[in-house]
Amino acid sequence: MHSDKGQTLPIYIWLTGILLFAAFAFFAFAQAASARNGAQSAADAAALAAAQDARDELLDGLVEAMGQDEDWLDWLDGDLAQGAGATAAAQQLAAENDATLQGGAVPTEVNGYPGYEVAVRTNYTVGESVIPGTEGMHANAHATAVIQPRCDIGPDVGPEKAVELDCDGEIVDIDPENFELDDLPDASVLFSVHLAE
């Protein structure tokens, strides 16, 4: 009987060690998942910031085109955004989420709509764990945000005529002959910005 207890103790110690290692390994995977989630949140925020900056630029271009009697309706397609401040906007949002933008905000196209793709890397690491090397590992993530026009333009509309736009149910009236800046709604009414699926 005494010898049976002596044989059980090493098995108990061995099983306890395995359970502890499994718990630490699970914690390491949880740390890595948390870092990945943080990186993805930073990438999403950076991509949205880049696209929103370009959307604001579209509104500025629309106003300028009206002032110079150009075909301002072209700006409502969303294709004319140059995204001059897109990278700076993406960098700022990445930094606010404790990450660094890798490269810049890269113009892209998704289903015919303009957008911006970004890549970020977390400034923090996964942290120390039972898995070697995690203390120096950073999480990386990518995201793409799209600018999508929200307004329907009729086929008989011209840049010199008064226009009634249906922007996802919100009616916007623009008369280029009697135009004031206050006539324009917020850029979010004319263009939606969302993450690419």
Which residue stretches match the model-derived regions?
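Low-complexity, S/T/G/P-rich flexible repeat/linker segments used as non-globular hinges
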Residues: 127-197
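Soluble periplasmic/extracytoplasmic beta-strand elements of cell-envelope proteins
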Residues: 49, 117-121, 140-144
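Alpha-helical assembly-interface signal, strongest on the long, hydrophobic N-terminal helix that forms
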Residues: 2-82
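Short amphipathic secondary-structure patches
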Residues: 52-126
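Residue-level marker of positions within ordered structural domains that often coincide
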Residues: 48, 99, 148
